[in-house]
């Protein structure tokens, strides 16, 4: 009970410390599907990677809105933890369907769809998955000084239970690749550490410089670049915690925070090549 009372006091203190809204100026803002709320689920990795794929297709002129409930249905008897690469592997094995065919409310109510209908064509979930995300289309990047740079490495993380490989590059190179990818109008899936004091969904901002090793605890899609009133560089993050913050669910992450607290990013190979 004392612990609960202390928690209430801490929450009240944080609420009183809410910062005034910072006015950001967009330099790049990519189109996106509506922001969702993952609730108590552990599926941030699915929300973020699907959002990245959706934005890529919107930029190509396709209207694609993918079902997170379908992914939850597929993995319900497996490990619920994962990374962006986990999502890519799952849809490569089991397919994906549209949000309209299997909305978020369907998980416990409707059977798993056998077909996807899109633009007058009929697909199996696996055929549809290959049409929205070709095998090998995305690549995974990390920056970890425990491994050699320039090599593909297996990150020793609980969420990487599939033992997926990541191209290991220096922090500054990773940051540059992310910025150039966004400026060339490609979405990026970000995975990293949101447990630092500089991260506040309530304020909609993640900022700070850190020397500590990042932990892997959240994923978001990067959908833009902006500047704060001091002309500092920020990345516009599409979160999956609903819309109850000053930016309707978006967050602004400083370049310094992203540089120091990134575990991995996922982008198309085209985005990586144009970002060289």
Region locations from a protein language model:
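Active-site nucleophilic cysteine motif
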Residues: 39-53, 79-89, 218
